[in-house]
């Protein structure tokens, strides 16, 4: 149940199928009949998890095929872009298909954005939703939702926004990082999918995680993403550049608290290479983890009103206000300037 609430069932299923996670079914009774029931229940559970594993593999293959087609399209038309979160994160897992897939998020800098719109609409014959509710347009292709970002993340401070945008655009122009997928157009050859460099990738995933935690709430899926990212990039992240950038965008205290949480609850090593944590960081680590566990995937576990409408919008706003007060000292400027807007956007999306 917990795995479902936090959208990490694929990770559990993969672990069980590979023999790295043991399955036990408990029963208060101790009898031969009870033992037989437990064995049957265990067999049913394992079979269901095997089905989950197969479904995840099929879904990942579909995402890979479509994303390879997208990368081929962008490459042919010389469009600068990066894919982030989602499929880019999945590549850091030991088995990419174990991570639950959602949307395909990609960013195109302003210099290429309008041309990219025309290329996608013409080549894929899709209608792109251009409503500027948040920071991206959206469209569906082959049953997969694409979010086409004109801005990767939004900040309350204009100064912070300009610094962040400049950093991201410089990284996109360099085009040094990516991952390979089997080319859907070119047969047996592979196509390179552009992604952010380790330091920039961490900043984006962390900032996205923290903002969701403040508004709707955030679950283990997104939190495990950060743990995997920090572990896999431990020798590639430029610590001085990272900490300086986080200070420039007003999120350094929040990141320190995250590191404390990762060290305490996820046994992350090497935290000292970033900074020396203090007592306040440790205190916020406990608060962060408690909020993650009570939230579930994007806060759905904590909602009382599951249907859309005014009740859901009011509940979203109420919950966000409580989170903002609890974590105000971790990112005060953005909470004051940006979060009210994020609450309004999130509430409107739930109407």
Briefly describe each language-model feature range.
Residues 1-29, 37-102, 108-351:
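Conserved NTP-donor binding/palm subdomain of two-metal-ion nucleotidyltransferases/polymerases, i.e.
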């Amino acid at each position: 149940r917990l795995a479902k609430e936090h959208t990490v069932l694929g990770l559990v299923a993969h672990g069980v199928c590979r023999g790295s996670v043991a399955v036990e079914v408990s029963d208060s009774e101790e009898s031969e009949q009870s033992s037989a029931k437990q064995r049957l229940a265990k067999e049913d559970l394992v079979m269901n998890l095997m089905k989950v594993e197969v479904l995840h593999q099929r879904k990942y293959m579909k995402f890979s095929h479509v994303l390879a087609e997208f990368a081929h399209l962008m490459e042919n038309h010389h469009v600068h872009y990066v894919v982030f979160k989602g499929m880019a994160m999945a590549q850091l897992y030991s088995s990419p298909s174990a991570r639950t897939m959602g949307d395909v998020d990609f960013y195109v800098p302003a210099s290429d954005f309008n041309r990219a719109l025309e290329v996608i609409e013409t080549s894929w014959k899709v209608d792109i939703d251009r409503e500027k509710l948040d920071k991206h347009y959206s469209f569906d292709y082959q049953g997969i939702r694409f979010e086409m970002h004109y801005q990767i993340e939004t900040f309350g401070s204009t100064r912070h926004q300009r610094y962040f945008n400049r950093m991201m655009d410089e990284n996109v122009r360099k085009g040094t990082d990516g991952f390979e997928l089997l080319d859907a157009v070119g047969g047996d050859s592979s196509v390179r999918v552009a992604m952010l460099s380790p330091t920039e990738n961490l900043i984006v995933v962390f900032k996205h995680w923290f903002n969701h935690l403040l508004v709707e709430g955030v679950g283990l899926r997104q939190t495990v993403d950060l743990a995997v990212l920090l572990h896999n990039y431990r020798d590639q992240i430029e610590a001085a550049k990272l900490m300086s950038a986080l200070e420039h965008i007003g999120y350094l205290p929040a990141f320190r608290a995250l590191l404390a949480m990762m060290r305490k609850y996820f046994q992350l090593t090497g935290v000292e290479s970033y900074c020396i944590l203090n007592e306040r960081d440790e205190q916020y680590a406990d608060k962060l983890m408690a909020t993650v566990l009570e939230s579930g995937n994007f806060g759905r576990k904590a909602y009382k009103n599951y249907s859309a409408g005014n009740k859901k919008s009011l509940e979203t706003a109420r919950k966000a206000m409580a989170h903002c007060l609890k974590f105000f000292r971790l990112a005060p400027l953005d909470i004051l300037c940006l979060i009210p807007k994020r609450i309004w956007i999130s509430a409107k999306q739930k109407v």
